[in-house]
From Swiss-Prot:
NAD(+) binds at G188, V189, G190, K191, V192, G193, H194. It comes from the Bacteria. This is Valine dehydrogenase. The active site is at K88. Its main location: cytoplasm.
Amino acid sequence: MTEADNGVLHTLFHSDQGGHEQVVLCQDRASGLKAVIAIHSTALGPALGGTRFYPYATEEEAVADVLNLSRGMSYKNAMAGLDHGGGKAVIIGDPEQIKSEDLLLAFGRFVASLGGRYVTACDVGTYVADMDVVARECRWTTGRSPENGGAGDSSVLTAFGVFQGMRASAEHLWGDPSLRGRKVGVAGVGKVGHHLVEHLLEDGADVVITDVREESVNRSTHKHPSVTAVADTEALIRTEGLDIYAPCALGGALDDDSVPVLTAKVVCGAANNQLAHPGVEKDLADRSILYAPDYVVNAGGVIQVADELRGFDFDRCKAKASKIFDTTLAIFARAKEDGIPPAAAADRIAEQRMSDAR
């Protein structure tokens, strides 16, 4: 066993505090595939979660990420009212360098070998066209194109759900769900953030954006000239008069550096795992910053892919995603009742649903 193998095993057995049911290490030498599939829980039903294609620095980092992400999917699916547990997959490597049809087909065979215990979908670095390829080897694939029996890109409903979470946050904090005149900062205007900006503008918000990809910023500012762009996330979170901060890129946006200087009164965004470490939710509460739990408000996408399994209906999905408004308000009420941060309140509600199902 190599030193790298030992590192992966150490991560699996000593860093897994979430009690995962199954972790599968996948390797196909012919295509260059290296992937990890993690099933956190099947208490509510088959594990459901996307496939992330990312150039992790080490295999240990990939394993740690998939454990964290799959656990988060259990909570997300529970809070979304879905009959699914939580799972996730990561493919290790730069998708722009190594993604190929053969690699995706090999990955599909690994997912298929689980016999339906895990259902995959798109995530960072994977797209509808990729799921169409995976589906050729695996029927437990969602996020496919409409012409291949799927629902297409889920970013539209994800953005809609985040918007509902923002409206609920505004209702809770200011007594009015309207965002008219509120200044909202969106960090990351890619697949989801771009659609979120449109909802915000339609509701009358003043929008400030940033993104590491200049082309994403240019797309938004070209389509919406009223949008203000700033250089980076640090500039965004320090924006004077910012009411709401929406992290919509990768996780860990709320950390020991960002929280102390954050000017917003609300955090509500599409990114997964926004809290960099345990305790950040308390830091936010200590600064009287209202945090809408990420896995609750960004559940629109998983609502869509779950619906795809029964024959996708957009109106049915949108109606379910609109309930994120009420769910978010219920979390804030539970947090106040129990004297805990909203993130802890959401966890308690999700854990109760999973416990009741066992």
